[in-house]
Amino acid sequence: SADIFLGVPFNIASYALLTHLVAKECGLEVGEFIHTFGDAHIYSNHMDAIHTQLSRDSYLPPQLKINTDKSIFDINYEDLELINYESHPAIKAPIAV
């Protein structure tokens, strides 16, 4: 399933990172990350947070720089850099159980 407000943004970020890491490991150029949803949903208790998110201006996406020649299995957080990353203040929303 796809929790549009909380889950999908995390999935996009993590799988986009994985796309870059796999391309690097295989010696390939990074292609595109395509995400499809099954059972996409928005929880009613997220509506205020969603309206806040939609009222904000977008920023240009940052660039990912992988600062190592290590294998995908040895890379850690310190080997990664986001260039020109900008963000708005966090929006809190409850996780559905």
UniProtKB/Swiss-Prot annotation:
Q: Which residues bind (6R)-5,10-methylene-5,6,7,8-tetrahydrofolate?
A: D3, A96
Which keywords label this protein? Cytoplasm, Methyltransferase, Nucleotide biosynthesis, Transferase
Q: What is its EC number?
A: 2.1.1.45
Q: Name one GO molecular function term.
A: thymidylate synthase activity
Q: Name one GO cellular component term.
A: cytosol
Query: What Pfam families is this protein classified in?
Result: Thymidylat_synt
* Keyword flag Metal-binding: no
Q: Member of which family?
A: Belongs to the thymidylate synthase family. Bacterial-type ThyA subfamily.
How it assembles, according to the record, is: Homodimer.
User: What this chain does, per the record?
Assistant: Catalyzes the reductive methylation of 2'-deoxyuridine-5'-monophosphate (dUMP) to 2'-deoxythymidine-5'-monophosphate (dTMP) while utilizing 5,10-methylenetetrahydrofolate (mTHF) as the methyl donor and reductant in the reaction, yielding dihydrofolate (DHF) as a by-product. This enzymatic reaction provides an intracellular de novo source of dTMP, an essential precursor for DNA biosynthesis.
Name recorded for this polypeptide: Thymidylate synthase
Please report the organism this UniProt entry assigns to the protein: Staphylococcus epidermidis
